[in-house]
Amino acid sequence: MVRVVKVWYDNEVSMDILKDKTVAVIGYGSQGEAQAKNMRDSGVHVILGLRPEGNSWKRAQKDGFEVYTIEEATKRADIVHILIPDLVQPKVYKEKIAPYLREGQALGFSHGFNIHYKQIVPPEYVDVIMVAPKSPGRRVREVFLEGFGVPALIAVYQDYTGHAKELALAMAKAIGATRAGVIETTFKDETESDLIGEQLVLVGGLIELIKKGFEVLVELGYPPELAYFEACNEAKLIMDLIYERGFTGMLKAVSDTAKYGGLTVGPKVIDEHVKENMRKYAERVRSGEFAKEWISKADKADEVLKELMKEIEEHEIEKVGRFIRRMSGLEK
């Protein structure tokens, strides 16, 4: 069954609820920097909560922000918007945010992982909301400066004040998202669909599809450079067309030979067996099994990721890719 979603636009949303309120953005990475700058440019009073020893402290000060420790920022804020990595959040929340929360404050997130999987359990006397731009932070900022915005999701997990949705929408407008459109969802749906999309398609699936296509071409005797162009480099051109025009628009833009070959062979390569595998690993997310596995590695996450990344870094496609990027002027 297809569910109808509510979409909110600029002319439907007011930022009045943010007047005289202070938003403390916790973290100054990709999303933290972009959202903090966009909200400030929209007239919101934004402060930052950071680690004094962190590299971002001086950078944020240089960018003109009031910067405090996380504890002090929490005390000063009406909305505490937590934009640090998922596995770091629970410890920071427990030690530096939770002890200083007061009645009527709001906790904000841009991903529902820790709320949905109960790694953070907020007190009942605060609002808990989500404002999740559907683009990397750099793009969130770029599009805002161009006068538009990227689409975003909002959700309410806990509405203590009775104004949680109004607050989430106002924050979405402040980062520019209502210029494009804001979809109302739930913490559960955002978290699970985000993880499933990353694993099956955007990160896991795409890397493996390109890598295996490259390997087949090389194993058949084609030069690695040629294989890279066909399996990887041109993937961006196709994705740009899909992004701008959809599948049908992309197909209209490629040759008839590409159309026929793609439409007849594609479903045989990415067949029902692949879909069954996708469903299997989607269920791991839905059951909480993936979250349990990832959370169990919290203390050694850097080491685990370094080992996994090493396998990719040493693959021939990466060596060839660096050569092609230098040819294209993308790397020095």
Curated annotation (Swiss-Prot):
Domain KARI N-terminal Rossmann: 5-185
Binding-site positions, substrate: 255
Catalytic activity: (2R)-2,3-dihydroxy-3-methylbutanoate + NADP(+) = (2S)-2-acetolactate + NADPH + H(+); (2R,3R)-2,3-dihydroxy-3-methylpentanoate + NADP(+) = (S)-2-ethyl-2-hydroxy-3-oxobutanoate + NADPH + H(+)
UniProt keyword terms in alphabetical order: Amino-acid biosynthesis, Branched-chain amino acid biosynthesis, Magnesium, Metal-binding, NADP, Oxidoreductase
Cofactor(s) this protein cannot do without: Mg(2+)
One Pfam family this sequence matches: KARI_C
Superkingdom in the source lineage: Archaea
Residues of the KARI C-terminal knotted domain: 186-331
Active site, per annotation: 111
GO biological process: isoleucine biosynthetic process; L-valine biosynthetic process
Binding site for Mg(2+) 1: 194, 198
Known pathway: Amino-acid biosynthesis; L-isoleucine biosynthesis; L-isoleucine from 2-oxobutanoate: step 2/4; Amino-acid biosynthesis; L-valine biosynthesis; L-valine from pyruvate: step 2/4
Top class in the EC scheme: oxidoreductase
InterPro entries linked: 6-PGluconate_DH-like_C_sf, KARI, KARI_C, KARI_N, KARI_prok, NAD(P)-bd_dom_sf
GO molecular function terms attached to this record: ketol-acid reductoisomerase activity; magnesium ion binding; NADP binding
Functional summary from the UniProt entry: Involved in the biosynthesis of branched-chain amino acids (BCAA). Catalyzes an alkyl-migration followed by a ketol-acid reduction of (S)-2-acetolactate (S2AL) to yield (R)-2,3-dihydroxy-isovalerate. In the isomerase reaction, S2AL is rearranged via a Mg-dependent methyl migration to produce 3-hydroxy-3-methyl-2-ketobutyrate (HMKB). In the reductase reaction, this 2-ketoacid undergoes a metal-dependent reduction by NADPH to yield (R)-2,3-dihydroxy-isovalerate.
HAMAP family to which the protein is assigned, alphabetical: IlvC
Assigned protein family: Belongs to the ketol-acid reductoisomerase family.
Protein name, per record: Ketol-acid reductoisomerase (NADP(+))
Protein's organism: Pyrococcus furiosus (strain ATCC 43587 / DSM 3638 / JCM 8422 / Vc1)
